[in-house]
């Protein structure tokens, strides 16, 4: 454990940020899973609706640095391609 006051404070802040980031990451993954579930079900309308809900969430997390911008772009591109493949 840290002995210096500033190091103790950083440890507390770091733990708080870790919990906050974990919550945001979990939320983002849930939205992505909803899109995959709709694609698996073969429901294009539901998949498109879920994608439209997921897109701003993923973009926001990328802008805040929670995930890399390329990862956000990759998720969106892959899901868009799969949705377009549905008849």
From Swiss-Prot:
* Annotated GO MF terms: ornithine decarboxylase inhibitor activity; small ribosomal subunit rRNA binding; structural constituent of ribosome
Q: Name one GO biological process term.
A: ribosomal small subunit assembly
Q: Which cysteines are joined by disulfide bonds?
A: none
- Could you name the domain of life of the organism this protein comes from? Bacteria
- List every stretch annotated Disordered: 1-26
Keywords of the record, alphabetical order, are: Ribonucleoprotein, Ribosomal protein, RNA-binding, rRNA-binding
Output the SUPFAM superfamilies linked to this UniProt entry.
Ribosomal protein S20
Q: What PANTHER family does UniProt report for this protein, alphabetically?
A: 30S RIBOSOMAL PROTEIN S20 (PTHR33398), SMALL RIBOSOMAL SUBUNIT PROTEIN BS20C (PTHR33398:SF1)
Q: Per the similarity annotation, which family is this?
A: Belongs to the bacterial ribosomal protein bS20 family.
What's the protein name?
Small ribosomal subunit protein bS20
Q: Which organism is it from?
A: Escherichia coli (strain K12)
Lineage start = Bacteria, Pseudomonadati, Pseudomonadota, Gammaproteobacteria, Enterobacterales
